[in-house]
From Swiss-Prot:
Keywords: Ribonucleoprotein, Ribosomal protein, RNA-binding, rRNA-binding
Family matches, as PROSITE patterns: RIBOSOMAL_S19 (PS00323)
HAMAP family: Ribosomal_uS19 (MF_00531)
Protein's gene: rpsS
Family in the record: Belongs to the universal ribosomal protein uS19 family.
Keyword 4Fe-4S: no
GO cellular component annotations of the record: cytoplasm; small ribosomal subunit
Record has Ribonucleoprotein as a keyword: yes
Gene3D superfamilies in the record: 30s Ribosomal Protein S19, Chain A
GO biological process terms on file: ribosomal small subunit assembly; translation
The protein's name: Small ribosomal subunit protein uS19
Molecular-function GO term, any one: structural constituent of ribosome
Known role: Protein S19 forms a complex with S13 that binds strongly to the 16S ribosomal RNA.
Transmembrane segment boundaries: none
Length: 92
């Protein structure tokens, strides 16, 4: 269920501070975060955020199309190796 409009989007306060400092200084440094639950806001557009996927940090360059989505949507946590297949050769 989506968050109530009267509450507004959730952004980790520490992450918001880092984003505001990066915007003021026009820094292109990567901002590392564990906060996958934070919503992408327009102030983040143009920044690169390294989002933790449980094992490592994956760089995510934020574009206008990502505004309103969560950071975790762009950092997959699971690796799909394919379904277990039939090991026998198939026909001639």
């Amino acid at each position: 269920m989506p968050r109530s409009l009267k509450k507004g989007p959730y952004i980790e306060p520490k992450l918001l501070n880092k984003v505001m400092v990066a915007q003021e200084s026009r820094s292109k440094r990567v901002i590392r975060t564990w906060s996958r639950r934070s919503t992408i806001i327009p102030e983040m557009v143009g920044l690169t955020l390294a989002v933790h996927n449980g094992k490592k940090f994956l760089p995510v360059f934020v574009t206008e199309n990502m505004v309103g989505h969560k950071l975790g949507e762009f950092s997959p946590t699971r690796t799909f190796y394919g379904h277990a297949g039939d090991k026998k050769t198939r026909g001639k």
